[in-house]
Amino acid sequence: MNQPGETTHFGFRDVPLNDKQTMVNDVFHSVASRYDLMNDLMSGGMHRLWKDVMITTLNPPRDDAPFRLLDVAGGTGDISFRAAKASGAGFQATVCDINTDMLEVGRQRAVQRHLDGQVDFVEGNAEALQFPDRSYDAYTIAFGIRNVPRIDLALKEAYRVLKPGSRFLCLEFSSVDVPGLNKIYDLFSFKVIPEIGRVVTGDAESYQYLVESIRKFPKPYDFAEMMRDAGFARVNWQMMSGGIVALHSGWRL
């Protein structure tokens, strides 16, 4: 239960905890139709390679064995579509997102890709999932968990809905650890990305928030400790592209 006056960060600003989710929702309502295009422009297409590593690590079965994936904050369906392509006939994915505009983009793309029979889209909150205990074979979240007001609750919910022996994978921006690259990365992040957002979507402010939210996300070792506190075992992470992103992994045993 939230305490009176409790605050959290929204980018570099402190805001009332109860207000953050609405503010994040407004950001993604604004950028939904151009979200994947902006990912290409902001990352130079690298997000595709990072997501491929995530799917390779997920390693879904390629035969007819049933496999249920929960893809949280996966609105446009990108991760689930990639997982479906790498899977056999037993694959089913549920894309859960709190933003209805992002979900609608995903639904349309699922139909275009003839994947609407394997991938379904539901509105839901990562902090209070509506799914039964021990009901999924894997949980993925890509570039989404930093937008959750209470990350600890989202991790506990992830653990709850996973079957024993199932895996949690989180792809998220991290801390650049290559000397020199960090300065270039900061310059690109704070000067270039908001301007790209302004030109492509007419909304620089939302991308300013997204850049700031990356800097506020816990360091990999701190996030790993949060995962352990939620119950996950065999926790580790893999840094990519000089520390721009990290793929975090944990198991419910």
Curated annotation (Swiss-Prot):
Q: Which domain of life is it from?
A: Bacteria
Respond yes or no to whether keyword Methyltransferase is given for this record: yes
Which processes are annotated in GO (biological process)? aerobic respiration; menaquinone biosynthetic process; methylation
Reaction catalyzed = a 2-demethylmenaquinol + S-adenosyl-L-methionine = a menaquinol + S-adenosyl-L-homocysteine + H(+); a 2-methoxy-6-(all-trans-polyprenyl)benzene-1,4-diol + S-adenosyl-L-methionine = a 5-methoxy-2-methyl-3-(all-trans-polyprenyl)benzene-1,4-diol + S-adenosyl-L-homocysteine + H(+)
Q: In which pathway does it act?
A: Quinol/quinone metabolism; menaquinone biosynthesis; menaquinol from 1,4-dihydroxy-2-naphthoate: step 2/2; Cofactor biosynthesis; ubiquinone biosynthesis
Q: Specify the enzyme's EC class, one word.
A: transferase
UniProt keywords (A-Z) are: Menaquinone biosynthesis, Methyltransferase, S-adenosyl-L-methionine, Transferase, Ubiquinone biosynthesis
Q: Name one Pfam family in it.
A: Ubie_methyltran
Query: Which InterPro entries does the protein's record reference?
Result: SAM-dependent_MTases_sf, UbiE/COQ5_MeTrFase, UbiE/COQ5_MeTrFase_CS
Entry GO MF terms: 2-methoxy-6-polyprenyl-1,4-benzoquinol methyltransferase activity; demethylmenaquinone methyltransferase activity
Question: Which residues hold S-adenosyl-L-methionine?
Answer: T76, D97, N125, A126
The yes or no answer to whether the keyword ATP-binding is present is no
Q: What is its EC number?
A: 2.1.1.163, 2.1.1.201
Q: What does this protein do?
A: Methyltransferase required for the conversion of demethylmenaquinol (DMKH2) to menaquinol (MKH2) and the conversion of 2-polyprenyl-6-methoxy-1,4-benzoquinol (DDMQH2) to 2-polyprenyl-3-methyl-6-methoxy-1,4-benzoquinol (DMQH2).
The family line of this record is: Belongs to the class I-like SAM-binding methyltransferase superfamily. MenG/UbiE family.
Output this protein's name.
Ubiquinone/menaquinone biosynthesis C-methyltransferase UbiE
